[in-house]
A protein has these predicted regions:
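Function-determining surface determinants
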Residues: 34-466
Length: 466
């Protein structure tokens, strides 16, 4: 790693000089055809590594001893690659080098699905011209990009692998132990990745369910690259992130709205779980709120997707919530089997569209209808419910209505994305202010926000007036 660290601190001319003394392999400059990388990532509790390794040894797969992987990630000063959801690195392993470009994909929970291109190199020096033109946003390599990219951060870890077969699918299990580093900032890598080499995604999920039956794993949505970028920006503490209004595509179907709503909830869950495990105790409430958002999303679409479709998922949510509200530590709660199984169940429910087998022909037609039309109808219903509940002062009974108020606010966050953001925010602020006043016991503020909320005009299409 010493030479690679030297490379990180030198200019291009010096990198070429040092490359001369590095091992060179006999590989022609040809890129591999684009592959759709499908992998499920877990963060491993360091105390559980030995037990995990013992468990992996029982799977009967082909074992590969740990091998050192050294990676340099590149970026421009203005973060051009990140802005286009692209990731560029050079990887070194046993004297072999490979340039990889990952482009925009999809992350659901810890399941990463994104295209990537790999180019074999004879030395650890970037040559962007070797990448196919289809990689670039406009179909061609930007003229000045090669001169602007520079090393941003690095990873150095040992990877131990097991190749296993699950229901006819080939899966690579990789246990990575090491660190990601940017300048003087560093943090450990202790991860498990399940990558589908051939076969069906369901096999990855099946194997994952087997592995999370033991404590010590949590799904991680933050890739090594995402962590490296954060370190390179100074490693500032991440703050609480309020749930944003869901922005669905203009022509989204109700089914796509359901998927987007649950992905938003899962993203909030994982984001605040990361904060909590890093020592931000206030984030625990937001983890529970995100799990509540999952439930509220299921209720919102319950007129189409029957409850029995999500019965197992909701049972696991209940078990996980019970673990979180107990007095156990963040580490114990987050790495528990209950939490891991609930999060994985939600990921699997989304990835496999597990609601589909429960829909009859009528429901199939409904779920393919316009999410925009669905949103307008349900915005009016939830607003009417709020007015019916809070139309008159409730005295000492406001706290009894907090669950209903929270559910309605969550539902509106999931439905309001087609309208002007300022109008939506102004409308929501009064109901959110009412909820905060109830929670904090501010009686005068309760009545102020209640009056403001019930008399405000709708921002959405209603009764043909918009």
């Amino acid at each position: 790693m010493a030479i690679w660290r030297k490379i990180l601190s030198t200019d291009k001319k010096e990198r070429v000089k040092f490359a001369v003394i590095l091992p060179i392999c006999d590989i022609t400059h040809k890129y591999k055809a684009m592959a759709q990388e499908i992998e499920l990532k877990f963060i491993v509790n360091h105390d559980a590594v030995d037990a995990l390794r013992d468990h992996l040894q029982t799977l009967g797969g082909e074992h590969h001893a740990p091998s050192q992987l050294q990676n340099i990630y590149y970026e421009t000063p203005d973060k051009w690659l990140r802005g286009h959801d692209m990731g560029l690195r050079i990887r070194g392993e046993n004297g072999r080098y490979e340039m990889t470009m990952k482009i925009a994909g999809r992350v659901t929970g810890g399941l990463h699905q994104r295209p990537e291109y790999n180019v074999a190199l004879s030395e650890p020096t970037l040559d962007l011209a070797l990448l196919p033109q289809e990689v670039w946003p406009n179909g061609e390599l930007p003229a000045d990009l090669a001169s602007r990219v520079q090393p941003l951060f690095s990873t150095d870890f040992y990877r131990e692998k097991w190749l296993v077969d699950v229901d006819g699918s080939r899966i690579e299990i990789a246990l990575d132990l090491g660190e990601v580093k940017a300048g003087e900032c560093a943090e450990p890598i202790c991860e498990l990745e399940l990558e589908l080499l051939s076969g069906e995604t369901r096999a990855v999920l099946k194997l994952a369910n087997q592995l999370v039956s033991q404590a010590g794993l949590r799904q991680g949505s933050l890739s090594k690259a995402a962590r490296g970028y954060h370190l390179a920006q100074g490693n500032a503490p991440r703050g609480i992130r309020p749930t944003a209004v869901l922005k669905a595509p203009a022509k989204a179907s109700i089914e796509q709205g359901l998927e987007a709503a649950l992905e938003l909830a899962l993203s909030q869950w994982q984001y605040h779980e990361e904060l909590w495990v890093r020592g931000n105790d206030a984030a625990k409430a937001d983890v529970l709120a995100a799990m509540g958002l999952v439930r509220h999303a299921l209720m919102l679409f319950g007129g189409i997707v029957p409850r029995k479709a999500s019965a197992h998922l909701r049972d696991l949510l209940t078990q996980s919530e019970a673990t979180l509200v107990s007095e156990v530590s963040a580490i114990t709660a987050i790495y528990s089997t209950q939490t891991a199984m609930a999060k994985l169940a939600l990921t699997e429910w989304l990835v496999t569209k597990a609601w589909q087998p429960f829909l009859d022909a009528k429901a199939q037609a409904k779920i393919a209808d316009s999410f925009k039309r669905f949103a307008d109808i349900h915005l009016s219903r939830h607003a009417a419910e709020l007015k019916a509940t809070f139309g008159q002062p409730l005295g000492d009974r406001y706290r009894d209505q907090l669950p209903r108020l929270t559910r309605d606010i969550d539902s509106i966050l999931l439905l309001a994305g087609y309208y002007d953001a300022n109008a939506v925010q102004a409308w929501l602020e009064n109901w959110q202010g009412l909820r905060h006043a109830i929670v904090t016991g501010q009686r005068i503020e309760v009545e102020h926000f209640r009056n403001e909320a019930i008399f405000q005009e709708p921002f959405w299409l209603h009764s043909g007036k918009r």
